């Protein structure tokens, strides 16, 4: 998305939410300009800030320019440099429409795109239709997308909204209702500033919005983070990150297994994805729990052995396995991969890499017993220099909220299928130095 003629100036003041006084750089004259955002923008529109102005198309308009972007000092945190923030409130919808029409949508090819779609008592930004799923290609999928522009950044984290918005709460509740009626629903946060990759609800300013987004996520509404390449005169979506709930992933996993891909094959793909994503430092310790998360680790162990990398499996309970996990553990056992039960005396300090497969995204509550001891040992060794990798999500974190009192601190977290909300909420940033997502062919429904 590109603006026409653009000039630069210095922000002086904002007499009201519609206009601002700006000193033009090229002439030194003070010009009254239209502000294309009625939000507060208090942390952006400060005296002396550099701004970008787009020339108005209508020569008879009272204001000759629109204020569309502003330079924010320390964008991303106190140690960061300045960066442009686009504050044009009309830009996100234009940008997302271009992105959709250009094939950017991450969940299939769209066959129809309609803006301003009426649903319930709201107008949702986009109604789309898409081709059916692999097992039912004749089906028409109905999709609703509500776009929100994010211009509020605090210490490298994006937040929405920047002011209380009952309209935004209403949209979330309508989307939750639509999801219950069979629509695929998305909130698309368009992040119109560089270096910011995610958005959190601004509960300090609007607690009700935080409650509404939680209810929407529980209903199956998905989240898109649309990162932008931001210049004073143009915007371009450069990256899309999709988030879903743990329940959506559970349902999608079951659907895929029943209709498309056998469960053992999916587990092998998950383990192979983790294996291929990591630069392994030998020897490798694999800390395995009791569920399918552990099964991914057993696949990794087999692939490491095939590649000549020494590894050892540490089991929370060598008597309990999921069905598919037990299948791959038996392969490891037959091939002579060493294993032992994790105890209070277990010392992992000799290992170059530790793979955390203790608890998966379905974990809720508090970590107890030997799992807590294993997490503390992994973190101790991580602080001594071991490279720590978490499979799907860091053990101890809730997959939906990202909260937890005892959790693994990883150098890398390898998400499987799609990112879950817990990868970007709660204590996720504290737990994960880096995170990547691997698509293994799960059909998200």
Task: Name what the model sees in each region.
Residues 192-239, 420:
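Domain-level recognition of nuclease-like catalytic cores that cleave nucleotide substrates
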Residues 29-44:
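Beta-strand/loop nucleic-acid-binding surfaces
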Residues 42, 78-115, 134:
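Acidic-basic catalytic patches of nuclease active cores, encompassing PD-(D/E)XK
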Residues 234-256, 352-445:
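YjeF_N-associated NAD(P)HX repair module
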Residues 156-166, 176-205:
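Nucleic-acid nuclease catalytic cores
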Residues 276-357, 368-390:
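Nucleotide and nucleotide-moiety/phosphate-recognizing core
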Residues 240-284:
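An N-terminal, well-structured beta->alpha segment
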Residues 9, 124-132, 138-161, 175:
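Conserved catalytic cores of phosphodiester-cleaving nucleases, focusing on short active-site segments
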């Amino acid at each position: 998305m590109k603006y026409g003629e653009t000039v630069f100036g210095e922000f002086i003041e904002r007499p009201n939410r519609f206009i601002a006084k700006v000193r033009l750089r090229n002439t030194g004259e003070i010009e009254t300009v239209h502000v294309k955002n009625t939000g507060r923008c208090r942390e952006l529109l400060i005296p002396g800030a550099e701004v970008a102005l787009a020339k108005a198309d209508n020569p008879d308009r009272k204001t000759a320019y629109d204020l569309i972007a502003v330079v924010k000092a320390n964008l991303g945190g106190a140690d960061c440099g300045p960066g442009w923030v686009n504050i044009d409130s009309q830009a996100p919808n234009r940008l997302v429409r271009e992105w959709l029409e250009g094939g950017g949508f991450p969940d299939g090819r769209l066959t129809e795109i309609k803006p301003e779609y009426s649903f319930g008592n709201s107008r949702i930004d986009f109604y789309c239709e898409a081709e059916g799923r692999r097992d039912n290609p004749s089906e028409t999928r109905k999709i609703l997308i509500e776009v929100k522009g994010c211009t509020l950044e605090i210490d490298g984290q994006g937040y929405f909204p920047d002011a209380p918005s009952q309209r935004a709460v209403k949209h979330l509740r309508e989307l939750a209702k639509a999801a219950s009626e069979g629509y695929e629903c998305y909130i698309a946060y368009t992040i119109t500033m560089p270096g910011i990759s995610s958005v959190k609800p601004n509960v300090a300013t609007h607690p009700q919005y935080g409650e509404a987004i939680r209810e929407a996520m529980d209903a199956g509404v998905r989240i898109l983070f649309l990162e932008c390449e931001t210049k004073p005169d143009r915007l371009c979506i450069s990256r899309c990150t999709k988030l879903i709930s743990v329940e959506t992933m559970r349902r999608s996993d079951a659907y895929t297994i029943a209709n498309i891909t056998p469960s053992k094959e999916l587990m092998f793909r998950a383990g192979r994805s983790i294996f291929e994503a990591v630069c392994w430092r030998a020897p490798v310790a694999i800390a395995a729990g009791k569920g399918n998360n552990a099964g991914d680790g057993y696949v990794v162990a087999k692939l490491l052995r095939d590649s000549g990398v020494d590894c050892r499996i540490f089991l929370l309970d060598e008597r309990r396995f999921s069905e598919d996990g037990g299948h791959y553990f038996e392969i490891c056992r037959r091939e002579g991969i060493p294993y032992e039960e994790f105890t209070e005396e277990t010392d992992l300090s000799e290992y170059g890499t530790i793979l955390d497969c203790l608890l998966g995204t379905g974990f809720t509550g508090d970590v107890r017993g030997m799992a807590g001891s294993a997490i503390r040992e992994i973190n101790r060794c991580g602080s001594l220099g071991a490279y720590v990798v978490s499979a799907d999500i860091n053990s101890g974190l809730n997959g939906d909220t990202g909260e937890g009192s005892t959790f693994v601190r990883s150098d890398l977290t390898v998400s499987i299928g799609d990112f879950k909300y817990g990868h970007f909420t709660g204590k996720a940033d504290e737990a994960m130095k880096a995170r990547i997502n691997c698509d293994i062919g799960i059909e998200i429904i």
